[in-house]
UniProtKB/Swiss-Prot annotation:
EC number: 4.3.2.10
Record-linked HAMAP family: HisF
Protein function: IGPS catalyzes the conversion of PRFAR and glutamine to IGP, AICAR and glutamate. The HisF subunit catalyzes the cyclization activity that produces IGP and AICAR from PRFAR using the ammonia provided by the HisH subunit.
Record SUPFAM superfamilies: Ribulose-phoshate binding barrel
InterPro entries: Aldolase_TIM, His_biosynth, HisF, IGPS_HisA/HisF, RibuloseP-bd_barrel
Main location: cytoplasm
Gene Ontology MF term list: imidazoleglycerol-phosphate synthase activity; lyase activity
Protein name: Imidazole glycerol phosphate synthase subunit HisF
Pathway the protein takes part in: Amino-acid biosynthesis; L-histidine biosynthesis; L-histidine from 5-phospho-alpha-D-ribose 1-diphosphate: step 5/9
Catalysed reactions, semicolon-separated: 5-[(5-phospho-1-deoxy-D-ribulos-1-ylimino)methylamino]-1-(5-phospho-beta-D-ribosyl)imidazole-4-carboxamide + L-glutamine = D-erythro-1-(imidazol-4-yl)glycerol 3-phosphate + 5-amino-1-(5-phospho-beta-D-ribosyl)imidazole-4-carboxamide + L-glutamate + H(+)
Taxonomic lineage from the root: Bacteria, Pseudomonadati, Pseudomonadota, Gammaproteobacteria, Alteromonadales
Pfam families attached to this UniProt entry: His_biosynth
Source organism per UniProt: Idiomarina loihiensis (strain ATCC BAA-735 / DSM 15497 / L2-TR)
Active-site residues, record numbering mapped to chain: D11, D130
Cellular component, GO annotation: cytoplasm
Amino acid sequence: MLAKRVIPCLDVRDGQVVKGVKFRNHEIIGDILPLAKRYAESGADELVFYDITASADGRTVDKSWVERVAREINIPFTVAGGIRSVEHAQTMLSMGADKISINSPALLNPNLINTLVEEFGQQCIVIGIDSFYNEQSGEYEVHQFTGDESKSHKSAWQTKDWLQEVISRGAGEIVLNCMNQDGVRQGYDIAQLSALRGHCSVPLIASGGAGEIQHFVDAFQKAQVDGALAASVFHKNLFSISEVKAAMAANNIAVRPIEALQETT
């Protein structure tokens, strides 16, 4: 059985790590490299970096910090933000990223998914989906440009339809960012994750809502996700990655021991 992944998420804006609540009101957390090193050394299975305003600003990720991160950590990491072409993706991968994630650019040009998969292989192409539950319609809607409050808006897609579309185009992994839960620490959206799990034939990563160690256990046991992203609980030192993994192991969830990670250093 494949080990489930615990994945700290670092939202980057203007060269620093930030964190918001429901994709709004971001506060500065700190510098990229010290946080990346801390998480890598404390047992993270991988890291995800989102340059949250790159797509809305019409630019791509700043190459300088990607290269520095690759030199300093020895666990896999994914980079996202404004990757709109083979050239952009090639640059990030050549700088040391293991995977690239695309979100708004894929909504603007779905064929980009096919192109990137053909060029680099399914295993390193991740699709991020920012999903918002509309209480009035009772539907889950895909939003885009969510890193910039002034440009964030609903797309033409409902979440399940977009999930199936990107998988049909070759996406190798899905990160489901549940916008209603983001930053509020009340638990992952188990209902939405469970509903989509049956339509997702590739690894599904939960994102948005972690506030307690039990929330990770619930996501793995109840929604059967393959990995769980978290940001504020780790940034604020509410608990450690080792505590999360200990709880997972105690609940018979397959986990990669921290000792095994440290042996690769």
